[in-house]
Amino acid sequence: MLLAFVWILAWPVAAFPQQKNSKEEFLVLPGEIGRSGGRIAVSLRAEPKTLNPLIAAETPSREIIGVMQADLVHINRATQLTETALAKSWKISPDGLQYTLVLRRGLKFSDGFPLDADDVLFTFQVYLNEKVHAPQRDLLLFEGKPISVRKVDLQTIVFELPKPYGVAERLFDGLAILPKHLLEKPYEEGKIGQLGTLATPPNQWAGLGPFRLKEYVAGQRLVLESNPYYWKTDAKGNRLPYLDELVFLFVPSADAQVLRFQSGETELISRLSAENFSVLSREQKDYTMVDAGPGLEYNFLFFNLSEPGEKTSARTLQELKWFREVKFRQAVSAAIDREAIVRLVYQGRGSALWGLVPPGNRR
């Protein structure tokens, strides 16, 4: 899916050229100049549950949120390098404890409201609040101590870490910056986790990504339109994205996804099984199959090591005791025939993994 969306944002089709405000500091992308207009339809196996990054836990929601929101810095998934994004620059103190980020000037949320350091402070305040239960919170804790954030001016924010962390820049990728002007009141009322349902009116939700909400039809589709305030342009100054619309069709059957793709109803499939890859390769018509190589995603099995409660059953207590034994976990790992899974489930289109770093990660 990652490769699909990289292609979407670079493909020559959508954002009408607009006049740039001289005070706006855009991120200019190199490469071939595209043309404006068009839409891409993507089939999803499951309907997303929310547009709220604070509670999104399942893949469909996170995929859609990913094109509606933006990060302070960006990790290029192809090169694994850290790149500028909402922050145009950053500086690290000699002791590695302080990160000073400078925002691009003149940036706006998808509803036209300006972005500044107060939005960043508000965002991290929300993520760190235990009562919000944001999944991002654990990333911002170091041995139980939270990262601290302070504003220097409207464009400059200082982050202080409790201890040095070699890849701290990556903390700023994957943390969507929230619109304080829309969310501060519900946050203070303890209702921020209730926001961002799919039925949310488009004018009540905003992000910093290339697309914004346009339409939702339950059980059928979710339509996003290009963000007219997006902060990236091509080399000629045309505001991106090129696409006018990005449409997600809810197609729960994998076979139905293939049929819709072959009929031209969709241009992308969010997840493709090995069986359907073979079908599309065998019946290839007016489309091209490309092997993009190994990705960064992987499937894994993990053990529940949480502390038992007062009502934990005797059987669960025994299982937790097993899980805490290193030799038991090693035995389970050794018992899994990874090569057979690759051969039988993925038809050879996968790789056995014995650690946390997938073969697609070349660094």
Describe the residue ranges of each PLM region.
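Bacterial N-terminal signal peptides
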Residues: 1-12
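Extracytoplasmic/periplasmic ligand-capture domains
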Residues: 16-32, 78, 104-137, 147-151, ...
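N-terminal lobe/hinge region of extracytoplasmic solute-binding protein
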Residues: 20-26, 41-94, 125, 204-208
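A structural "hinge/loop" feature
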Residues: 27, 46-62, 86, 113, ...
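Small-molecule pocket liners
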Residues: 40, 69-71, 99, 220-222, ...
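Acidic glycine-/aspartate-rich tracts in secreted/extracellular proteins
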Residues: 47-48, 106-107, 164-165
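A generic structural motif
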Residues: 99-102, 155-161, 222-225
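Surface-exposed binding/hinge segments that line
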Residues: 137-189, 215-217
